[in-house]
Amino acid sequence: MYYFTSDVHLGAGDETFSRRTEQRFVKWLDKVAEDADAIFLVGDIFDFWFEYGRVIPKGFVRVLGKLAELTDRGVKIYFFIGNHDMWCRDYLEKECGVKTFFKPQHMTLAGKEVFIAHGDNMNVGNQPMLRLMNTCFRSRILRKLFSWCVHPDLALKFGQWWSGKSRKSHLKDHITPSSLEFLIDYARDYKRHNTTTDYVVFGHMHYPYDHAEEHLRVLFLSNWDAEVKYAAMDRDGRISLKTF
């Protein structure tokens, strides 16, 4: 089995809410690890993550420990950066054994061709300010300057404030199926250029949705604020959204 989830946003909310989310996520990891060929964490697992050369954010020890435990047991875990945890470096890979991807990936799973991406920074060609902001945030030079010039405490306070603003823009009450159309269009265009693609999996929108059309499925994963919808794909290549 292959499992996909996203937008856990560990660290969001007050301490009680954050701890409860972390505990639920650990239970989910334990559950799916029982028969997982691989687990895909499709971005924004952390509400904010900025990794210095020798410093990582305080907290998340249950999740970090669980990731290390599972990979030590041989479970394959793949981590895709999202717009909230794009400033990862090599900590998760070196310390937790989690393969980290900084770009979308096209993979063959159970005989199916699957394109996996968080979903941010896509179809933004007509949004110059968003394109510029994404370029700045992903700049290695600016990231290095930030780590040299800004104390970790200040960096995390700023990051948590910024992440809170960004997360509120994707409140589920504000999202409808029509809000997903720009990513569905992206998936269609990707399919035109990569004709063997069977499935496209996105996070980011905090709205679970299974869009099917001829020769293409596009699945959107939920966030973890309430009922969780994750994707599961069996060894015959059948994929669907499940509830946790």
Predicted regions and their residues:
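Active-site glycine-centered loops adjacent to acidic/histidine catalytic or metal-binding residues
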Residues: 7, 44, 82, 118, ...
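Core catalytic region of metal-dependent phosphoesterases/phosphodiesterases
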Residues: 5, 10-109
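Short coil/turn segments at beta-strand junctions that form active-site/ligand-binding loops
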Residues: 35-37, 75-76, 112-113, 195-198, ...
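Beta-strand-turn-beta hairpins that frame and shape the catalytic cleft
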Residues: 1-3, 107-115, 213-218
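Active-site-proximal loop/helix segment associated with metal-binding centers of metalloenzymes
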Residues: 119-183
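Short, well-ordered, mixed-charge alpha-helical segments that flank or form enzyme active sites
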Residues: 86-90, 116-117, 123-126
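Conserved beta-sheet core of the metallophosphoesterase superfamily
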Residues: 97-102, 120, 124-132, 137, ...
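Residue-level marker for buried hydrophobic side chains located in beta-strands
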Residues: 2-4, 39-41, 115, 201
